[in-house]
Amino acid sequence: MRKLLLLIAASLLGVGLYAQSAKIKLDAPTTRTTCTNNSFKQFDASFSFNEVELTKVETKGGTFASVSIPGAFPTGEVGSPEVPAVRKLIAVPVGATPVVRVKSFTEQVYSLNQYGSEKLMPHQPSMSKSDDPEKVPFVYNAAAYARKGFVGQELTQVEMLGTMRGVRIAALTINPVQYDVVANQLKVRNNIEIEVSFQGADEVATQRLYDASFSPYFETAYKQLFNRDVYTDHGDLYNTPVRMLVVAGAKFKEALKPWLTWKAQKGFYLDVHYTDEAEVGTTNASIKAFIHKKYNDGLAASAAPVFLALVGDTDVISGEKGKKTKKVTDLYYSAVDGDYFPEMYTFRMSASSPEELTNIIDKVLMYEKATMPDKSYLEKVLLIAGADYSWNSQVGQPTIKYGMQYYYNQEHGYTDVYNYLKAPYTGCYSHLNTGVSFANYTAHGSETAWADPLLTTSQLKALTNKDKYFLAIGNCCITAQFDYVQPCFGEVITRVKEKGAYAYIGSSPNSYWGEDYYWSVGANAVFGVQPTFEGTSMGSYDATFLEDSYNTVNSIMWAGNLAATHAGNIGNITHIGAHYYWEAYHVLGDGSVMPYRAMPKTNTYTLPASLPQNQASYSIQASAGSYVAISKDGVLYGTGVANASGVATVSMTKQITENGNYDVVITRSNYLPVIKQIQVGEPSPYQPVSNLTATTQGQKVTLKWEAPSAKKAEGSREVKRIGDGLFVTIEPANDVRANEAKVVLAADNVWGDNTGYQFLLDADHNTFGSVIPATGPLFTGTASSNLYSANFEYLVPANADPVVTTQNIIVTGQGEVVIPGGVYDYCITNPEPASGKMWIAGDGGNQPARYDDFTFEAGKKYTFTMRRAGMGDGTDMEVEDDSPASYTYTVYRDGTKIKEGLTATTFEEDGVAAGNHEYCVEVKYTAGVSPKVCKDVTVEGSNEFAPVQNLTGSSVGQKVTLKWDAPNGTPNPNPNPNPNPGTTLSESFENGIPASWKTIDADGDGHGWKPGNAPGIAGYNSNGCVYSESFGLGGIGVLTPDNYLITPALDLPNGGKLTFWVCAQDANYASEHYAVYASSTGNDASNFTNALLEETITAKGVRSPKAIRGRIQGTWRQKTVDLPAGTKYVAFRHFQSTDMFYIDLDEVEIKANGKRADFTETFESSTHGEAPAEWTTIDADGDGQGWLCLSSGQLDWLTAHGGSNVVSSFSWNGMALNPDNYLISKDVTGATKVKYYYAVNDGFPGDHYAVMISKTGTNAGDFTVVFEETPNGINKGGARFGLSTEANGAKPQSVWIERTVDLPAGTKYVAFRHYNCSDLNYILLDDIQFTMGGSPTPTDYTYTVYRDGTKIKEGLTETTFEEDGVATGNHEYCVEVKYTAGVSPKKCVDVTVNSTQFNPVQNLTAEQAPNSMDAILKWNAPASKRAEVLNEDFENGIPASWKTIDADGDGNNWTTTPPPGGSSFAGHNSAICVSSASHINFEGPQNPDNYLVTPELSLPGGGTLTFWVCAQDANYASEHYAVYASSTGNDASNFANALLEEVLTAKTVVTAPEAIRGTRAQGTWYQKTVQLPAGTKYVAFRHFGCTDFFWINLDDVVITSGNAPSYTYTIYRNNTQIASGVTETTYRDPDLATGFYTYGVKVVYPNGESAIETATLNITSLADVTAQKPYTLTVVGKTITVTCQGEAMIYDMNGRRLAAGRNTVVYTAQGGHYAVMVVVDGKSYVEKLAVK
């Protein structure tokens, strides 16, 4: 990836570009830069430009012109005219001095006056992000602008910069432009041809240095050199291993071990040292000297470290002050050559304690090993261009847009690119919690924060991205200043436990706008104009996505620093300079990590079954470019890189000399790692399976393999031909010990002359080719008597000897020997004493009876029978095995045995936990086991085993009853093709209407469904919803809507359930009409015809056309709709209503229905001789003979697979037939597979059939084939069946054959078609089983019940359990869900068994709430030993017996009349509560420390406190409070230890400091329970430790003596239960129609229930009310006028206050929406309006 073209001019702050420009065409057709004839001695280069562009600019110093040339940078002395120049980084050989010779160029002068151009603008210095733009002076050198004649640099310049990792770097600058400021003329030199020669170059030393320092990890840097091709002839680069020098604080030795082990396993050669070593030391100087020596020593040995890891904070490894930055830097630990270029990739794992280091390491190991349970977050990134008035648009936005345009997009695999280019930044950091793989922020920063949008170290500590760790880059000031007095931002984000980042790249000093821009996108000459790939050099974004490179976190930082180096000026350093940036940027965390780019690929690899010892190298197959490492116990033995053919030669730096299991790790950039073990030692004599494959469907894993080639477990017979006359029979040897085999040699006077044979076995298997010749006899002439004993450990017969007699050969009969199973060389001899020759049998056959490395499997008996074959004794080998159970298969998952005793070559496991798993299959023989063969499997989904929900327990007498709900809300890891699909869709509209939804304005009035937010339109218990209007504000008036809101496409093969919340925006204008539809086809209005739900929202009262619409929002109601199978879209339609107000919709959720039950068709209900019941048949050939049911009770020759009935179709039935018969199932929508059994006539087996599916109907033309076959030669039985009396001759039935066929999605019907055959006999079908997809049925898991820790019942499928005869006393009952893959957490409930009286409630009353149609029930708690000590609802204010303390002394305290309005906020289920403020409207932020203290209490035995608390504004909710108890006094000093302390949960992120607080949704009321200690006298509620939120509300404080309540209340209306689990002694039943109601309240105890107490109530209608506004609001043109007897404020929709005042406020608006807030007599009014 190379970038050459650089674009136009720079515009620094204080410079604004006009759209006034001119282009001067030059004397070259194109802009072009080339490097040719590249060698160690020289290279040629050419530079040509096709145009100069002039742009008029306005600056603080006046009007100037900016000049730019494609591919050039702006240069010049600060304050002098700025001209463009070209800059290239070049490699310079060792010892060389680069000399430039200009071969030719053209030159032309251009008068800028002819183009109406001003003088060229003065060159400006770089601007730090810490600078105040208003205080930065505009630099103008008057003397420079008075010079006459052309001024400028020499045409070419070269400057040596330093040495970077073995390559000397220089900057080559071309200055094509000179300028005469007085004459206002440009001199342009073009078509420049130069030669750069390297005088004094030492080619040998250059190559030696490059070879010694080379590592593929530095290719990112090498690729940025102009003449980089000089090194393309380098040797075998990929044999260069990765080396890392680690210097760590001594206290980290133990914590560092897991990381060191992993890095060694990954293939890093580690050199680890600690600061307690004398040669390392503890000072900066000693550590630096030690590191430099290590690097130089390594360089001399061609083993220079690639990475330098510093472990610890500055207390153990200090940094040093930068020469340029004057801030802490680690640069000089790795800049060994004395310049500012480092030689090693350096990173610091900064930790102050071993625990913090463990936090960093745990994240790194999970990320690098890819063990995170959900990898989908890797496809998401967060990109933020932070706030800055000028530079956000000039630098921030172009930077982020560049990243999105070229890399972070769908083309590169990213599903979600959360980008925030400018304010508002609402909710931007919430994505860190839900999961992103990369977060990049560019703008301002501090030591402990990203500045705007603000992300502090405190917020980092509160992140919740467990298992979703990311790389973060902060292009901002000082966030990586790691010697700051407290942990800096970069340290905290990496140190936090189970959250945050695994690495952070950031700057220690202030960073600069221009250089940060170059750092990210590459060097260029443009600010404020979108950069292009072609117009920039390589930046950090580009380096991240380099293919086939080792892209590490460190290399990303290097690429950024090199881009800043590229942009530096030659001779006139007006930028801050490259040296500054190499000192500035650091990697905190692990810089050696290779970040994944979206979803990583899967490596294709093959490992040998075992490795031999003492090898110099091993070959391992892996994806090309993979790095392969072999290690054991954290010690690295060898590494290698897979070549283009996918073969890695792993060179062993430490040879393997011991048997055992060794780790093999395969890594490659953007590939998932392979982490395996491989056995070292002799190959196992037990043959493994072959061709193991694994597939997944949902949480179901299917394994398939082939049996060991030596035999088949199904009992088949295999014959292998070896030669002409040798038969080897292999059978189980049950009479030998484990790991042994028996060899038998048998003969029967083969030649009739009493000559015989010997069997010689060499256990060392090293005699073949030497002692045992490849051809010819074993020996000729007389052999030494020790020939056998010296070479062959085992002989048959046992006394075999080279001196042949009839006693030491096998002539007739057999001999045997028992040997250890394993690999042998062997030969079978045929002695010829007369000639003195020892022949080897079978010499004239196809394969002589001599073998090199033959495997004798343990537990087997090998019988070699000698036979005559023609004129010689050639060889045949027969392998026999008549025992189908001679071995079985064992299956392992993740090292755990999960199934053994298998005989089939397939295995299925359902309900597998989500994540990566390794499945292995092992063959278990009688005497031993084979090596495992393994396969990696990734199962998608969630890992959690869902427990039961809502467990309750009760007792009556000694009978205990438990009830619970089935597991829900989490995927069910259980035997199912597709476990619980969970929620298909969930939308709260907090961020508007998603792009995937569709809206249709069918009436065409321009008003469709819209997103709404407070103020004005509050969602259901949230800030936002969607709405549709039948009356519009702002002068719109009456509307007649026909508006559709349509979901994205859904997948509901079995239907689903829709729930949503709906309300009328104005309770007095509530009669909005709407309907819900489902479509199984498209999402146009015409696709929605039959409503599933249609209704008109109930009005609360009589309306008046003049009422103030929108003041009182109606009640939110939840609706539930069943969706039919196949639903693809759901539509919400607002229509047939007019002149109301708005209908609001929120919290739409759709869940897929559970699967249909699996079912099996046995045909037992069908009648012999008739078509099968509930199936459809088609006789397509019209011969009158289709599918029929047959019964074995009617036909002697027939045997059903199960039961007595089958279905059949004939191709011969007394005469030849040509069948085309369909057997069609009923509707099987949702089926994923069909399993069936078939049989044919064993003598005429060719009846062809097909399995077909239809997604539509049951006509023959609706079906397509998914599987077909022609049965042939089954030959497996038939003897047990009788002879056919119907067929022509004996035609026995075959055995039943099982088949399973996968069905495609959308299958509705399945057909079995019998066709394409004739004159055979029949095909039979039986036991057809359909497996259905979807969520689990109740029997997919079972329940286990425990009492007091003892299991008392398991295998339950119902959600209830009863046990009688339970002993009196307290018992704990628990219920656990048992899945195939694991068990859920237990859910428990306490049950008391006794004869206690179950007391009812007391003093139940029912009354109609004032000015509403609600009923309010109140009662007293049931009589009990517990006494209610205090019960306060603050309805009459704060009682005098309570005490308030304004500890901060600001005059604001707890109150029931909060300013500015003076009216109480709504209480919990009442009108009034008590409140304390951290922000008061019109006053601003508060810093409360306010106490609310109870009256004196008497709780000698302790007690229980319950209260309700909420934030008044859900968007400003983070109020901090605590509860204390005092046993002494009631002053603030008496309350020391908090019993409860917390921050209320915020619903959304605060969007604007000036938002109208309190006018949006009130926060959720939470009930809290606190146990009070014995002797408590006072309880205090303290509001403190927070500022600038809004108000905290407190209500319904109840204190009882003794233990917490042990009962709840159940509420009934007209004998129907309407609520349960109620804990307070009041209940509100809203929105009732007029009429009489009977209410009941029951007390539910843990072990019983009370009688129901009742009360009656008559709800009457409300009187007509016409609300009057205490203000007037008019809009005339664009002028808004508010008149009132109070205060008025006008806001925009971002919450910014635009105007405010008393009595009359006038504001001239732009077009858009506004909110008006009026406060009159302590009451607040808010109205939303639109200005056109």
Swiss-Prot record:
Ca(2+) 2 binds at residues 337, 339, 341, 343. Disulfide bonds: none annotated. SUPFAM superfamilies: Caspase-like (SSF52129). Residues 970-980 have a biased composition (Pro residues). Residues 965-988 are annotated as: Disordered. GO terms for molecular function: calcium ion binding; cysteine-type endopeptidase activity. It catalyses: Endopeptidase with strict specificity for lysyl bonds. It is an enzyme of class 3 (hydrolase). Ca(2+) 4 binds at residues 1001, 1003, 1005, 1007, 1043. CDD domains: Peptidase_C25_N_gingipain (cd10913). GO terms for biological process: hemolysis in another organism; proteolysis. Transmembrane segments: none annotated. Residues 25-228 form a propeptide. The active site is at residues 444, 477. The keyword ATP-binding does not apply. Ca(2+) 5 binds at residues 1433, 1435, 1470, 1472, 1595. Ca(2+) 3 binds at residues 988, 990, 1022, 1024, 1146-1147. The record marks 228-229, 737-738, 1156-1157, 1291-1292 as: Cleavage. Keywords: Calcium, Hydrolase, Metal-binding, Protease, Secreted, Signal, Thiol protease, Virulence, Zymogen. Gene3D superfamilies: 2.60.120.200, 2.60.40.3800, 3.40.50.1460, Gingipain r, domain 1 (3.40.50.10390), Immunoglobulins (2.60.40.10). Proteolytically cleaved into a catalytic subunit and three adhesins. Arg-gingipain is involved in this post-translational processing. Belongs to the peptidase C25 family. Cysteine proteinase with a strong preference for substrates with Lys in the P1 position. Hydrolyzes bovine hemoglobin, bovine serum albumin, casein, human placental type I collagen and human IgA and IgG. Disrupts the functions of polymorphonuclear leukocytes. May act as a virulence factor in the development of peridontal disease. Involved in the coaggregation of P.gingivalis with other oral bacteria. Has hemolytic activity; this is mediated by the adhesin domains and does not require the catalytic domain. This is Lys-gingipain W83.
